[in-house]
Amino acid sequence: MLLWGRWKLAAGLAGLALSLELFYRYMRRRKPLREVLFFPVPVTCIEPVLSPMKQCSCPLPHTDSAFSRLLVQLLGAQRSLELCVFTFSSPSLARALLILHRRDVRVRVITDNDYMAAPGSQIGPLRSAGVAVRHDQSSGYMHHKFAVVDGTVVLTGSLNWTVQAFQSNKENILITDDTVIVKAYQKEFERLWEEYDPATYNFFPEKENK
């Protein structure tokens, strides 16, 4: 019986070692994620990305685009999505965040206080749906434009999340899973998330200075 137990233990350890070796081989073979998206892009149908189970017969072109690839990256989130963006008025991107929120993916948004109430802003609807949103409380702009997916992928560049940015402006987004870069952006998000905690807001700064 003792010999049988030792044999089972040895077999288990051998299996674990083999699994780890296969995992490490896979990681070595896996190509790093390095993609750059450029805008503007033509208007195309994004329903196959947002609602893959539904058939769409709209007249828009059903082709791949930088915008659809951006949506694919965001909707690939399994655990978390951290978004830091200056202005957010794209209904399609708001819809993507709500899809993630309903999947119980933790979605957190940081934005600029001067622009979050602008006409067409999606911040109000996101908050109403239960998405966690925080904003700055300073005279300077919260001008970041980046997202961190599952703590493993970062999307960053010049792009604001507006229809004009996607369809009219010359913009770019870099997508990478470089560990050093992702950690830096994750750290910056967490720093701002704590800094913009509503519990620490000073709503009467003029009284404090007297």
From Swiss-Prot:
* Family that this chain belongs to: Belongs to the phospholipase D family. MitoPLD/Zucchini subfamily.
Q: Which Pfam families match?
A: PLDc_2 (PF13091)
- What are its E.C. numbers? 3.1.-.-, 3.1.4.-
Q: What is this protein called?
A: Mitochondrial cardiolipin hydrolase
Keywords, in A-Z order: Differentiation, Endonuclease, Hydrolase, Lipid degradation, Lipid metabolism, Meiosis, Membrane, Metal-binding, Mitochondrion, Mitochondrion outer membrane, Nuclease, Spermatogenesis, Transmembrane, Transmembrane helix
The lineage's top-level taxon is Eukaryota
TM region positions: 6-24
Q: Which organism is it from?
A: Xenopus laevis
Q: What is the lineage of its organism?
A: Eukaryota, Metazoa, Chordata, Craniata, Vertebrata
